[in-house]
Amino acid sequence: MIFLPISSIETKTYIFQSIVILVCVLITASIMSVVERRVLGLLQNRYGPNRVGWQGTLQVVADMIKLFFKEDWIPTFSKKITFLIAPILAFISLLLVITIIPLSPSIVIVNLDIGVLFFLMMASLSVYSVLLAGWSSNNKYALLGSIRATAQTLSYEVFLGLSCMGVVARAKSFNMIDIVDSQIGLWNIIPQFFGFLAFFIAGLALCHRHPFDQPESEQELADGYHIEYSSIKFGLFFIGEYISIIVVSSLISTMFFGGWLGPLFPSYFWFILKTLCFMMIFILIRASLPRPRYDKMMLFGWKVCFPLTLINLIFTALIMLY
């Protein structure tokens, strides 16, 4: 692990680089919410948000103003401290994962030797925010939504972790930079194709995105575990979902598509391009797929994703041994 540099110049550079990357992630997440609504509008033969600014470009600003000026209401029947902690935990848990993802060989906030394990740890921590939000709201719909989300996330995190192990075995390291370096000449998408499929599907479930958005299903649970949240607290949940999409897209680019590897252009250009492509795929999936029944979604995980990860691990072991 690389700790904070000692010299004052290096320390200032490190802090500045960290702030710039995290602010860029937050801005990207905000913009993505508007891009998603515009793309969904085009695919559904309607306009989408196009009134604030040119073609709706300032819709992000309008949304932020609306959230900040809404009443910051805490239900009288809720567990207040837990109710306040839950959205902060949801926002921070996956935002911290950004710190270990390298944009290039030289642009990484924290170069952790246990990078993959750190991601899995933060992903597990995000489950607590959902469970605490549903329980502390003291609302039956919020509680049902949080139970659904917890069961779903815990189940698919098993496949998420197993799908990472093939990549780790091939790189012989949990370090993200080592994983990218191991893909020079051959990206992991080819030898780890089954692992990629399982990771991508589990990533959708981790982000609670279509078709794995049962915890927030409006028709059944009235918006799920954050039904009692408003103002900035709801905004933290809202922006946290898009941060999780950025994190999963970045990890797919890093672990399976060579990260910053690419010809001609600067290394960070290729990383950003690959990440943006997967973020767009997340949006297109939301526009294309229906919401399956909850029990079918859970069965799909254990009957399809779990065997896929096992086949991938066996295949990887055979290649490494022989």
UniProtKB/Swiss-Prot annotation:
The protein's role, per its UniProt record: NDH-1 shuttles electrons from NADH, via FMN and iron-sulfur (Fe-S) centers, to quinones in the respiratory chain. The immediate electron acceptor for the enzyme in this species is believed to be ubiquinone. Couples the redox reaction to proton translocation (for every two electrons transferred, four hydrogen ions are translocated across the cytoplasmic membrane), and thus conserves the redox energy in a proton gradient. This subunit may bind ubiquinone.
Q: Name one Pfam family in it.
A: NADHdh
Does the record bear Transmembrane helix in its keywords?
yes
- Which species expresses this protein natively? Buchnera aphidicola subsp. Baizongia pistaciae (strain Bp)
Q: How does it assemble?
A: NDH-1 is composed of 13 different subunits. Subunits NuoA, H, J, K, L, M, N constitute the membrane sector of the complex.
Q: Which reaction does it catalyse?
A: a quinone + NADH + 5 H(+)(in) = a quinol + NAD(+) + 4 H(+)(out)
Q: What is this protein called?
A: NADH-quinone oxidoreductase subunit H
Name a GO CC annotation attached to this entry. plasma membrane
